Amino acid sequence: MAYTIIVHLLAKNDASCIQKLKDKLVEASQVYSKDPETLSWFVMQDFEEPRRFAIVERYVGEESQKYHLENPYWQTFDPYVLPLLEEPMDLRRLGELEGSVM
């Protein structure tokens, strides 16, 4: 059963903040996708509200998240991203249901 984290982010209502957040999320996806035991690390932007973004992180198991947290890049992520946000990140931790199909 994969361990999944879904994060919703809302950028400040400023074109520069939106673009900076978008660029940082794409960069983060390229970095974190290479971490051991990371199944996928997707970033998405809302079609109707371009200030809204989502991250879907999938790991082999909950303990696999340690590789993500030990990645030196992680230390740069929050300090860069948090000032670009209108509100705190909404982070949810989930376990994929057995028998579900991708």
Question: How would you describe each model-predicted region?
Answer:
Residues 1-3, 101-102:
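Eukaryotic N-terminal low-complexity, Ser/Thr- and Lys/Arg-rich leader segments
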Residues 2-35, 39, 43:
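N-terminal first-folded block
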Residues 27, 31-39, 58-92:
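An amphipathic, aromatic/His-enriched active-site/gating alpha helix that lines ligand/cofactor pockets
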Residues 3-10, 42-69:
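Short, well-ordered beta-strand segments in beta-rich or mixed alpha/beta enzyme
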Residues 17, 51, 73:
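Short phosphate-engaging motifs
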Residues 10, 43-51, 79-102:
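Glycine-rich beta-strand-turn "strand-cap" elements at beta-sheet edges
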